[in-house]
């Protein structure tokens, strides 16, 4: 796991994390273990749209996230964030448009990104952005 904690304003959840938490809420155990209980939880429109594109129902995903975390704040990604994301893609070729917009949102909100995507974690590290990269293994379960 990569975690570069510091002062943060909550957590931004990535698409892969939201989908896995929907399927298996136990992976959210880091939330209590790392002392994040009660912090702001953000899900942005990019995450919801990507999940919907993969066949998930946005309302069901949000309902499940609210059951797990309590209040969940849903935000749009601004045009400025999208443009900033495109700039980030040019600097870090492992990013694609969805991830770059999520990363730009995370940077703007000064939150900690929660993901299962190792490449997105590397991009966060490259751009000095707080992140938690979780790993799920068959043998050990969740690695935080």
List where the protein language model places each region.
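PIN/NYN-family metal-dependent endoribonuclease catalytic core
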Residues: 10-13, 23, 29-60, 66-69, ...
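Acidic, PIN/NYN-like endoribonuclease modules and their adjacent C-terminal/linker elements
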Residues: 1-8, 43, 108-114, 118-144
């Amino acid at each position: 796991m990569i975690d570069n904690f510091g002062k943060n304003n909550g957590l931004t959840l990535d698409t892969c994390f939201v989908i896995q938490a929907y399927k298996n809420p136990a992976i959210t155990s880091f939330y209590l273990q790392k002392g994040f209980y009660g912090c702001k939880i953000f899900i942005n429109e990019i995450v919801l749209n990507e999940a919907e594109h993969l066949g998930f129902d946005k309302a069901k995903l949000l309902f499940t996230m609210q059951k797990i975390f309590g209040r969940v704040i849903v935000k749009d990604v601004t045009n400025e964030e999208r443009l900033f994301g495109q700039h980030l893609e040019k600097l870090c070729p492992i990013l694609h448009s969805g991830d770059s917009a999520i990363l730009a949102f995370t940077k703007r909100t000064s939150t900690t990104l929660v993901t299962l995507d190792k490449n997105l974690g590397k991009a966060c590290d490259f751009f000095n952005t707080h992140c938690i990269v979780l790993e799920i293994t068959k043998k050990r379960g969740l690695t935080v």
